[in-house]
């Protein structure tokens, strides 16, 4: 006897690629950007003509014209099966920090520069996206970080990051002093411009610019990258993703320190504060066109050499 699975309701969707069609699609983009608006208009028309219910993030909906259902990111997360982010990696990061708490897939259309997280071309997305919407896609889960600032033992601020959490001096560049602990075991003290704690996703971003190694996305690891350390022996270190990173700021530092999450959210840090960075329970479900190859992306985006023979 055959089993009849009802996939008509969005509630029944799975975190793996078992459902062949999406139902409700959310569009998210970079506000006040002409190229992004053009792509969003094409996407909205194309998806609507195919019978999908389409919701548009409220910051860009007003720029697309009338008869657009405008909602916030939380409603997109709650109602949609798929979110399409049009823009660069920064736009993807901003959306991902909100959408990771929901069970929906996220795919990107690149309207930025490198676009490590945005797979689809803006001028010819139809063919690849049609296959994705018909169930031909690869699913990849990326874990997030949770950063917390404690003062006198009390939690003062927290947020999540897809790429990295960075302890730095704030608006004025200067050396800061802090201690670093891994799972409550003292590792070292630092005199540096700051510290980057990065996920594998973020290893091709700020951490790479600071001399860190590239971690493949499937690794369950974190990389700690000191920023301009005042020593010749301090190098980036990779630790298990289950590790808890604690940074204790010296009381002798100035008062304008910050922890930045993906460069978007800034948490104020005072001398003597403790910063805890650990893996979040939230995961981003990235959707890629079938056959996505991470090393092809690296080779293309970073200008690596092609095959010799």
Swiss-Prot record:
Q: Where is the active site?
A: 89
Cellular compartments annotated: Cytoplasm
The reply on keyword ATP-binding is: yes
GO BP terms: namely: NAD metabolic process; NADP biosynthetic process
What keywords are assigned to this protein?
ATP-binding, Cytoplasm, Kinase, NAD, NADP, Nucleotide-binding, Transferase
Q: Which cofactors does it use? A: a divalent metal cation
Select a single GO molecular function from the record's annotations and give it: NAD+ kinase activity
InterPro entries documented for this protein? ATP-NAD_kinase_N, ATP-NAD_kinase_PpnK-typ_C, NAD/diacylglycerol_kinase_sf, NADK
The entry's NAD(+)-binding residues are 89-90, 163-164, 174, 191, 193, 204-209
Report if keyword Kinase is assigned. yes
Tell me where on the tree of life, at the top rank, the source sits: Bacteria
Give the main EC class. transferase
Enzyme Commission number(s): 2.7.1.23
What cellular-component terms does GO give this entry? cytoplasm
Q: Which reaction does it catalyse?
A: NAD(+) + ATP = ADP + NADP(+) + H(+)
Q: Which PANTHER family match?
A: NAD KINASE
Record family assignment: Belongs to the NAD kinase family.
Q: What does this protein do?
A: Involved in the regulation of the intracellular balance of NAD and NADP, and is a key enzyme in the biosynthesis of NADP. Catalyzes specifically the phosphorylation on 2'-hydroxyl of the adenosine moiety of NAD to yield NADP.
Q: Which NCBIfam families match?
A: PRK01231.1 (NF002306), PRK03378.1 (NF002893)
Q: This chain belongs to which protein, by name?
A: NAD kinase
- Species of origin: Shewanella baltica (strain OS185)
Taxonomy of the source species: Bacteria, Pseudomonadati, Pseudomonadota, Gammaproteobacteria, Alteromonadales
């Amino acid at each position: 006897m055959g089993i009849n699975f009802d996939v008509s309701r969005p509630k029944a969707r799975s975190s793996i690629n078992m459902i062949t069609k999406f139902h409700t699609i959310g569009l998210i983009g970079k506000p006040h950007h002409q190229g992004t608006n053009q792509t969003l208009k094409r996407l909205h028309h194309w998806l609507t003509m195919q019978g999908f219910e389409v919701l548009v993030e409220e910051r860009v909906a007003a720029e697309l014209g009338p008869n657009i259902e405008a909602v916030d990111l939380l409603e997109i997360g709650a109602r949609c099966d798929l979110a399409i982010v049009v823009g660069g990696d920064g736009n993807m990061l901003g959306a991902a920090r909100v959408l990771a708490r929901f069970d929906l897939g996220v795919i990107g259309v690149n309207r930025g520069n490198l676009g490590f997280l945005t797979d689809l071309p803006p001028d010819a997305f139809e063919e690849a996206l049609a296959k994705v919407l018909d169930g031909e896609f690869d699913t990849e889960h990326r874990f997030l970080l949770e950063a917390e600032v404690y003062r006198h033992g009390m939690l003062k601020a927290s947020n999540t990051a897809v790429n990295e959490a960075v302890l730095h001096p704030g608006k004025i560049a200067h050396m800061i002093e802090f201690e670093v602990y891994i799972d409550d075991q003292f590792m070292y003290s630092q005199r540096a411009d700051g510290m980057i704690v990065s996920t594998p996703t973020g290893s091709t971003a700020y951490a790479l610019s600071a001399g860190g190694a590239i971690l493949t996305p499937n690794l369950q690891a974190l990389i700690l990258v000191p920023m301009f350390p005042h020593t010749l022996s301090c190098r980036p270190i990779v630790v298990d993703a289950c590790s808890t990173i604690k940074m204790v700021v010296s009381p002798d530092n100035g008062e304008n320190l910050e922890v930045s999450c993906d460069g978007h959210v800034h948490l104020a840090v005072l001398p003597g504060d403790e910063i805890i960075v650990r893996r979040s329970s939230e995961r981003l479900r990235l959707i890629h066109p079938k056959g996505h190859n991470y090393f092809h992306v690296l080779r293309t985006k970073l200008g690596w050499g092609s095959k010799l023979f």
